[in-house]
């Protein structure tokens, strides 16, 4: 359900929105704002996913050392 919301914008963003509408890329100022909010939502979703991954890593404890030679030797032994 849509609702009208009043937002105060400075001259920079007002000019930017006007240019997007006048250039034909968007039909209305609301279209421009919705596009910007979709991008912000996508960005915030990615940031949250990264934060969640970092939290999982942090909670998993200290990393174990990795020896590539031992790993390769084990893979050759197991898989020929």
UniProtKB/Swiss-Prot annotation:
SUPFAM superfamilies with a match to the protein in the record: Ribbon-helix-helix (SSF47598)
Domain of life: Bacteria
UniProt cross-references to InterPro entries, sorted A to Z: ParD, ParD_sf, Ribbon_hlx_hlx
NCBIfam families: antidote_CC2985
Sequence similarity: Belongs to the ParD antitoxin family.
PANTHER family cross-referenced by the UniProt entry: ANTITOXIN PARD (PTHR36582:SF2)
Name assigned to this protein: Antitoxin ParD
Provenance organism: Xylella fastidiosa (strain 9a5c)
Protein encoded by which gene: parD
